């Protein structure tokens, strides 16, 4: 009997302790469980690999910088397309509208669409969602890009690569798309966050083509005005 | 000896009843709606969602639809708050529009508590806050329930072992609770589960009223990769990108991404696919929703400060949702939603000059930050 009482008292103390523990904190709060469901940290590698960071050229005070030459007006008519189908092409479309550019926009343009075009601005960056929405695979996209870029080369159409997505548009597939376009590019315009490892400035330096680094996407307005002559 | 046992049992019984009464009061409070001020002369009409989904009538999931019509015709904009009730900035944005906006042209349809049943409970073992409050300049206090992201199981039970509804989303194993997630079951079913009836009501409202743009307001924890992103259906990409660009030009570094083709049942996919409307969804950062947060507190929910996430940010372990010592207050999160809504209306008007959506009298971003929600929310009409 006495042992039962001791067990009951111990149980009561344990329960009280548990209630106090879960009820502690603010009046209407409880402690979060360590195993509570929720999203997990992903894609941290880009920010973890900062030891090999490239020199930063832009800042709030210096919103854009052109290396290896000067930013210049390119010849119209302009065409805007994507390689990789990320939403960055849509942002570039909004920017082009903002600066009052005259251009044709088709994110999935084919070589045959570029008749009479003088300058193609290509927003690079892979998006599985974008590819899915367009109903094409990464391989289809590469084939389209290859055909388009070869057409540009054969018809003296200037290619400008635009990389506006920063670090979120770096990675294996995004870099594969960017590499395809870089080989045909006469100029690069990019948000500098995407050049943390110096990939694009190194390429521009090797090929001696101008690269315009931009602090934030909102700072694209002025460089675009120069490119389209507005 | 026997009398002693009887007395002891009676004391224990009374103690248990007392505990039930005390805790029951808290549970019952969650079923009491938080009033919304209707003193704004810009409010034209308040209808119930059951007008668009009759099966909701008389249920805990039926919810108010506030309609603010402009004097001039124009586009129609639907603001959804409380799709996930614990994502509080979305609901507060909707309430701020209801209580302050004047529509000059076009029409606003606002559902502040899209999943009304979700406001009647919190998620067990998640350590959530149940109620937040704001003291207004007149001394009155506005209370808002926090709720949780799913319909209350006392309103929709049991969850099936397997479900494959008309959203195209297959639910099995641990996913079956998502049958009570409003943002997994669009376009809904007029004869389906309670949640699907809400989905159907919103879907039917969009079709019946010929809504042009849908804005589904959400919040997410810091680990979520699309914090401060507008997710837009392909039909909404042009207007969405223009809106996001304008927010960037105003100093708000938001981004846009396209809705995934397989985001079955989510508003930005399913409502975009099944209606004529441009479907968008925006996520603000709410550290209280992160799984690595510290103890739940008022400072965390309203101040948006969490030392764990500041530390995680400082170690460079986040690629989205970075948090500084300044935190991200409920004022700022609600302001971000307000700005995104405003810029979507502006971008729509720019693209459709014959059907503009023009809204005035909304506090500015700086008003939200400097004056706070306590000066933007209106006292409740007596």
Model region roles, listed by residue range:
Chain A
Residues 1-10:
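Bacterial N-terminal signal peptides that target proteins for export
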Residues 6, 20-42:
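Bacterial lipoprotein signal-peptidase II cleavage site
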Residues 15-19:
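Hydrophobic core
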Residues 25-28, 51-72, 194-230:
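Charged, low-complexity C-terminal accessory regions
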Residues 71-98:
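Short, charged N-terminal beta->alpha structural module
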Residues 96-116:
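A short, well-structured beta->alpha microelement
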Residues 132-156, 204-211:
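A short, gly/pro- and small-residue-rich
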Residues 170-192:
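Short, electropositive alpha-helical surface patch
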């Amino acid at each position: 009997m006495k042992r039962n009482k001791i067990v009951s008292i111990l149980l009561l103390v344990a329960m009280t302790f548990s209630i106090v523990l879960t009820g502690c904190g603010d009046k209407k709060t409880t402690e979060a469980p360590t195993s509570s469901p929720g999203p997990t940290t992903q894609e941290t590698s880009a920010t973890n690999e900062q030891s090999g960071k490239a020199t930063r050229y832009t800042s709030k005070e210096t919103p854009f910088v052109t290396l290896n030459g000067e930013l210049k007006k390119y010849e119209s008519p302009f065409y805007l397309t994507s390689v990789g189908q990320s939403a960055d092409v849509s942002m570039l479309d909004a920017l082009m509208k903002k600066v009052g550019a005259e251009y044709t926009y088709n994110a999935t343009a084919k070589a045959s669409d570029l008749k009479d075009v003088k300058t193609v601005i290509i927003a690079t960056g892979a998006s599985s969602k974008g590819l899915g929405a367009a109903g094409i695979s990464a391989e289809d996209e590469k084939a389209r890009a290859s055909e388009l870029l070869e057409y540009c080369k054969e018809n003296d159409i200037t290619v400008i690569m635009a990389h506006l997505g920063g670090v979120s548009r770096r990675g294996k597939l995004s870099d594969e798309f960017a590499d395809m376009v870089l080989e045909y590019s006469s100029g690069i315009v990019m948000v500098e966050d995407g050049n943390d490892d110096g990939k694009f400035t190194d390429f521009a330096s090797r090929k001696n083509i101008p690269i315009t680094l931009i602090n934030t996407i909102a700072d694209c307005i002025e460089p675009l005005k120069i490119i389209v002559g507005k | 000896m026997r009398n002693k046992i009887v007395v002891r049992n009676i004391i224990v019984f009374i103690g248990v009843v007392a505990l039930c009464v005390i805790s029951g009061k808290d549970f019952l409070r969650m079923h009491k709606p938080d009033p919304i001020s209707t003193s704004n002369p810009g409010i034209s009409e308040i209808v119930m969602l059951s007008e668009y989904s009759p099966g909701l009538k008389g249920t805990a999931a039926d919810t108010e639809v506030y309609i603010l019509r402009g004097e001039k015709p124009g586009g129609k904009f639907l603001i959804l708050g409380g799709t996930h009730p614990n994502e509080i900035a979305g609901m507060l944005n909707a309430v701020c529009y209801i209580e302050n906006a004047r529509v000059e042209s076009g029409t606003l349809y606002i559902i502040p508590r899209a999943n009304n049943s979700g406001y009647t409970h919190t998620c067990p073992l998640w350590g959530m806050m149940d109620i937040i409050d704001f003291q207004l300049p007149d001394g009155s206090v506005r209370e808002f329930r926090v709720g949780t992201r799913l319909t209350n199981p006392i309103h929709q039970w049991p969850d099936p072992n397997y479900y494959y509804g008309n959203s195209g989303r297959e639910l099995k194993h641990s996913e079956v609770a998502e049958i009570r997630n409003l943002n997994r079951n669009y376009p809904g079913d007029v004869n389906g589960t309670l949640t699907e009836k809400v989905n159907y009501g919103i879907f039917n409202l969009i079709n019946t009223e010929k809504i042009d743009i849908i804005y589904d307001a959400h919040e997410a924890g810091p680990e979520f990769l699309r914090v401060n992103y507008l997710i837009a259906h392909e039909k909404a990409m042009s207007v969405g990108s223009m809106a996001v660009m304008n927010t960037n030009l105003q100093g708000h570094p938001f981004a846009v991404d396209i809705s995934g083709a397989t985001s079955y049942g989510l508003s930005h996919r399913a409502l975009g696919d099944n209606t004529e409307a441009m479907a968008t969804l925006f996520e603000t950062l709410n550290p209280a929703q992160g799984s690595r947060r510290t103890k739940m507190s008022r400072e965390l929910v309203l101040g948006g400060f969490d030392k764990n996430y500041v530390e995680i940010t400082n170690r460079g372990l986040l690629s989205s949702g970075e948090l500084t010592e300044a935190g991200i207050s409920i004022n700022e999160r609600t302001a971000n939603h307000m700005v995104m809504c405003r810029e979507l209306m502006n971008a729509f008007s720019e693209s459709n000059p014959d059907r503009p959506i023009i809204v005035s009298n909304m506090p500015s971003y700086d008003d939200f930050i400097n004056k706070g929600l306590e000066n933007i929310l209106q006292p409740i009409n007596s």
